[in-house]
């Protein structure tokens, strides 16, 4: 192949690459539930839940998720139980507020997109005495105060 053809081919590839738009997301964070996996350990002859992994994907257009300030709690988790009339927040259980370190985008853009896994330990099941199904509802707040959509784990049996 001649040098001219290679140069033209390189120019076309470079031009097409420059035309590809970078992904742009809303400045309000968006979450999408991925998975919830409970882990158990043996206590005597009984298997007892002791931790869980909650995984969700996120997008944020202005890239201000997380914080360098360890007192800024970006992730808010609320525990719900279904006692026969649909899922209701259990007011006896304190909400969980989680610090998320400042997240940075790969590349030159400001927008963020990725997957986040939160370990719930100790036991992800708050009330072992009841047999009611439970779920967690999760929301994130960015540094500008934008609150994401609320995501929920599927109903979990105890």
Say what each PLM segment does:
Residues 15-18:
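C-terminal motif of bacterial Sec signal peptides marking the signal peptidase cleavage site
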Residues 2-9:
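Sec-dependent signal peptide recognition
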Residues 20-23:
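Bacterial signal peptide processing site
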Residues 28-158:
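First exposed extracellular module after export/assembly in secreted or surface-exposed proteins
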């Amino acid at each position: 192949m001649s040098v001219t053809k290679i140069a033209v081919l390189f120019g076309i590839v470079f031009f097409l690459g420059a035309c590809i738009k970078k992904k742009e997301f809303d400045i309000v964070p968006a979450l999408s539930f991925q998975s919830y996996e409970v882990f158990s350990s043996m206590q005597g002859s009984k298997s007892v839940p002791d931790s869980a992994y909650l995984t969700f994907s996120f997008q944020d257009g202005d890239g201000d998720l997380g914080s360098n300030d360890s007192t800024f709690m970006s992730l808010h988790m609320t525990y719900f139980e279904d006692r026969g009339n649909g899922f209701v927040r259990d007011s006896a259980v304190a909400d969980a507020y989680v610090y998320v370190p400042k997240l940075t985008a790969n590349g030159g853009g400001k927008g963020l997109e990725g997957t986040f896994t939160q370990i719930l330990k100790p036991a992800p099941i708050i009330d072992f005495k009841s047999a009611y199904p439970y779920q967690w509802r999760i929301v994130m707040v960015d540094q500008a105060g934008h609150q994401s959509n609320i995501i929920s784990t599927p109903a979990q049996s105890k």
